């Protein structure tokens, strides 16, 4: 459940499992079921619409504000509004499963269904969300803290969600004939010694090498070439535009709706002109078509195949979702992350720490800020480091590794 960045790795994994002869059913928020089905996956709708929520007035307010407490309040309120319907839908899908795989937002429910069916549960994470001393909770703070405080931030987040959600969870458990849970899924799953697949690269976070086989860092789960071809997301004329000039800088905000598209397009165009580069702008979930500038050096696309297009670019500026970050780094692009919330701040700090990018908050977005952060990345040092990192990332076979872990859990 979540934005496309949350869903696409699951779709890639489901496709790989199906190619191995497994029957796979994926429960998704209703707004992304069509995307998954076009990619050849048996996707079923859950009673939640992430796009509607993010584009609602309340969703827009907390996205624009960047306040973590407001984010938590809205997330908890929206979760409580939809969770009973989501639980019902998930229960209908889980019967007869040999294994249940769940992402962070529905981990409580997914692990409960695995317990009900008496089958293994595997978590699928896009950032280090289990308590650890290396990194703080990506929700609670964007700061690097001493190890005890890093662990404490995870406990704070766990307890906040547990206080707000344990009654709904235990009502769900009772409907399945299970006893009440007395601790959050983080605590229960860690004690049970289960496996959490970390769908990000060890080359980005070498500090977590000590997590071992229970939390393997497999890398980014990417769509197969067949899935990318089936989706056919490149717009007509894009390849010709790319070939007609110098490699552009990519600008995109993915599933984060842009509140003032005309203003944002104008400041991107201004920044690109000052940088002396062409601009490829991915509209994502924002409606920018009515504001497209009449400028041959600026191209706005509603959809695009990131794996196919980004290697033709010179640098990337985006919101810092785990999927977008993995895609731009895999393409060898120095990357500026203009973060909105959650793990986006974390990935922004990561690219800066690795010397392959820079970061600032979306609330600070301006043409001047874009020029100041992007210009140094177009020089040799950051570009060379980004290319070297891409070479290391290319050696990972994340999807096959994840499939092997799942098959091993079922044996």
Language-model segments: residues:
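Donor-nucleotide binding loops and adjacent catalytic segments primarily
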Residues: 14, 200-315
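Phosphate/nucleotide-donor binding subsite
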Residues: 42, 46-99, 169
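Nucleotide-activated sugar donor-binding and catalytic core shared by glycosyltransferases
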Residues: 1-25, 31-40, 71, 100, ...
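Conserved nucleotide-sugar donor-interacting segment of glycosyltransferase catalytic cores
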Residues: 82-151, 203-204
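Short, charged, surface-exposed secondary-structure boundary motifs
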Residues: 53-58, 131-138, 226-231, 310-312, ...
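Short internal beta-strands
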Residues: 23-29, 278-283
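Alpha-helix C-terminal capping/helix-to-coil transition sites in glycosyltransferase folds
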Residues: 95-96, 192, 311-312
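Short gly/pro/ser/thr-enriched loop/turn and capping motifs at secondary-structure boundaries
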Residues: 32-34, 50-54, 123, 127-134, ...
